[in-house]
Amino acid sequence: TARTDSSFGIGATYVTTAGDSTVTIGAGFADSTTNTSGTQLVSDAGGMHIGVTAVTGDLTIGVGYADGDTFTDDGAAVADANTQVDGTVVKAGVKYVSGDITLNIGAVSGEAKDSTTTGTAGTTDDAWDEVNASVSYAVASGVSAVLGYTTVDVQDEGASDTSGGSAWYVGATMSF
């Protein structure tokens, strides 16, 4: 079992205009101290993030970066012992609206090293790389048709994992 002894978080957002664009910058930091029964972890959970978005008319562009560490307790079995995870992620996206049509493209790239030897960073990377693109068309008020594509590449302990792949999708979104 785990108990959080203390935690804190702080963040800030700044919004400004630059010509015809509205720019938003946000950042934050959080940390916590946790005690566990059994093996005491020496690396507590914490992290930071920063992101920027810019909106110019019908075009929105955003990018963000996060870095942090945490631990998980996946159970009592030896294979599920306490695991320390140190990781980073970068996300970026672009959206363009033209009348009833919206185009979206986004990318995510995350990397982490995990270790069951708490306090010691892992030596091989787990990774998740994803790209998504979609086109939606406003069919009626509150109803949009969507056509999209996504591709995901996953690595576990430095080797390709079969949970990744690519797919086309067709759907609808509704808002009331």
Which sequence ranges carry the predicted segments?
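Outer-membrane beta-barrel proteins
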Residues: 1-176
